[in-house]
Amino acid sequence: MFAFPVTLLLIGVLALIFASEMWLQVQYYGWAEAISPQILVDLGANYPPALLAGEYWRLLTSCFLHVSFLHLLMNSYALYLFGPMVERNFGRGKLIQTFLVTGMLGSLATNVLHRSDGGYISAGASGAIFGLFGVIFFAGKYHAKRLPKELQSWLNQNMLLLVGMSFAPQIDKWGHFGGLAAGLLLGWSYVSQHRGSAPPLTGEVKRSEDSHE
């Protein structure tokens, strides 16, 4: 894992920010499994009324906040799975770029496509996680003929799992799909930049059933 410092750094940043959320939660509202909506809004969650007031920075800051420890744990584990593959194959800069760009576009998709009265609150790195997987998936399909069958199967299984879980209750599916679409486009861009010189997608494959418990 220490061979992938940017992935480790991102996981550490998410953990530190959540620790700050929990500290504020305990200080002002008492212990709870989920962070208070007011704290999430105050710290920069995706909140349409605030965005309409010009607080566009929430499209980014919301990607670093999490609603509960389980929420953080799931996204951190997904980052542990997908981050090193992007970092190994495309570089540290591309990993940071992918995380930030797809996370923001996922947040934007939520605001554009979410059908509600606009009073919802959205937070989490899921859009960025889906973006990272989008890059991996596109690169894998581009190099499909040169990929081991195990890796091809891993990509397909995770795509089905990620899309399927997006329809669960209380899940921001538009943020997921917005991040995924942005990741696929970035994957196309990255592969195009290295066409003819890039090696096949490589990476340690984790069993899909271990990816989403």
Show the residue positions of the predicted features.
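A detector for small-residue-rich transmembrane helices and their helix-helix packing motifs
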Residues: 1-212
